Amino acid sequence: MFIKKNDKVKVIAGKDKGKEGTVEKVFPAQDRVIVKGINIVKKHQKPTNANPNGGIVEVEAPIHVSNVMLIDPSNNEATRVGFKVVDGKKVRVSKKSGEIL
């Protein structure tokens, strides 16, 4: 997967199209990511010891990795990601600028 935790991404499809945020969690098996402040859903929470009242809480739901693009730190634009071997290590490379991410 080409998206990692703490990457800055832009949503390119869905109800939050055009919004930007940082990746909080990655689920490689499901090809999904959780982005801070994006894809907020309301979850009905049962009463527990920690939250005795329960109620409706807003949480970030996972979004499919195909619906986000990595933001290139050099020019702050959404870019596709490629891979290159540098000094025997595989690194991510911006397709737009050619910079190592």
From Swiss-Prot:
GO biological process, alphabetically ordered: translation
Keywords: Ribonucleoprotein, Ribosomal protein, RNA-binding, rRNA-binding
RNA-binding keyword on record: yes
Any single Pfam family the record assigns to this protein: KOW
GO cellular component: ribonucleoprotein complex; ribosome
Highest taxon listed in the record's lineage: Bacteria
Gene3D superfamilies cross-referenced by the UniProt entry: 2.30.30.30
MF terms in GO: rRNA binding; structural constituent of ribosome
Subunit structure: Part of the 50S ribosomal subunit.
Family: Belongs to the universal ribosomal protein uL24 family.
Function: One of two assembly initiator proteins, it binds directly to the 5'-end of the 23S rRNA, where it nucleates assembly of the 50S subunit.
The protein, known as: Large ribosomal subunit protein uL24
Organism: Ligilactobacillus salivarius (strain UCC118) (Lactobacillus salivarius)
